[in-house]
UniProtKB/Swiss-Prot annotation:
Protein family membership: Belongs to the L6 tetraspanin family.
Disulfide bond annotation, renumbered to this chain: none
Membrane-topology descriptor: Multi-pass membrane protein
Keyword check for Zinc: no
UniProt subcellular location: Membrane
Highest taxon, organism lineage: Eukaryota
Tissue: Highly expressed in skin and lung. Moderately expressed in lymph nodes and kidneys. Also present in thymic stroma and fibroblasts.
Keyword Cell inner membrane: no
Originating organism: Mus musculus
Protein name: Transmembrane 4 L6 family member 1
Glycosylation sites: N129, N142
Keywords associated with the record: Glycoprotein, Membrane, Transmembrane, Transmembrane helix
Length: 202
């Protein structure tokens, strides 16, 4: 498989991962499908960092479309030398991949911190706070503690599920962008395969 085809497959994968990150982050604003918790500032502070919308989402679309668009570029013609156009394109894709690495890393960090701190919820006395902040993430392994959150209902499940989705997809994005850094450097330095004879398995 040519270097550019590998980049294209990575690009399509990043688009889907970005969509899932955006959707997961958006759902965090509406526990139980209600908007009042967002308007009353009763959401985890990490929800407002837009990690899935910006870091794992919109910022990830830039490298994704760069990788996908590489397949449509002219194979030859740069400075009068054949294949230089594609080689320059492959090397430039490394820069786009680095942007993706930054965005996905941001999403991974925020999602991890969000999981460690836990949701913001109301306790038995009606006080809103981070009930599990002092547990250092141990609440994730002890579901019997989740009953300490009275409102919103099932907020712990909601919080843990969506932040876990963000963490998982952002980690996948990070790995894919890292693969493209290697792929782009190989394609740029070792040469782009214009013919079917120069192929490798991605």
């Amino acid at each position: 498989m040519c270097y550019v085809k590998c980049a294209r497959y990575i690009g399509y994968s990043l688009v889907w991962a970005a969509v899932f990150c955006i959707v997961a982050n958006a759902l965090l604003y509406f526990p139980n499908g209600e908007t009042k918790y967002a308007t009353e500032d009763h959401l985890s502070r990490f929800v407002w960092y837009f990690a899935g919308i910006v870091g794992g989402g919109l910022l990830m679309l830039l490298p994704a479309f760069v990788f996908i668009g590489m397949d449509e570029e002219d194979c030859c013609g740069c400075c009068g030398y054949e294949n230089y156009g594609k080689r320059c394109s492959m090397l430039s894709s490394v820069l786009a991949a680095l942007i993706g690495i930054v965005g996905s890393a941001y999403c991974v960090i925020v999602a991890s911190l969000g999981l460690a701190e836990g949701p913001k919820c109301s306790d038995a006395h009606g006080v809103w706070n981070y009930t599990f902040a002092s547990t250092e993430g141990q609440y994730l392994l002890n579901s019997s503690m989740w009953s300490k959150c009275y409102e919103p209902k099932h907020i712990v499940e909601w919080h843990v599920t969506l932040f876990s989705i963000l963490l998982a997809f952002a980690a996948v994005e990070f790995i894919l962008c890292l693969i493209q850094v290697i792929n782009g450097m190989l394609g740029g330095l070792c040469g782009y395969c214009c013919s079917r004879q120069q192929q490798y398995n991605c």
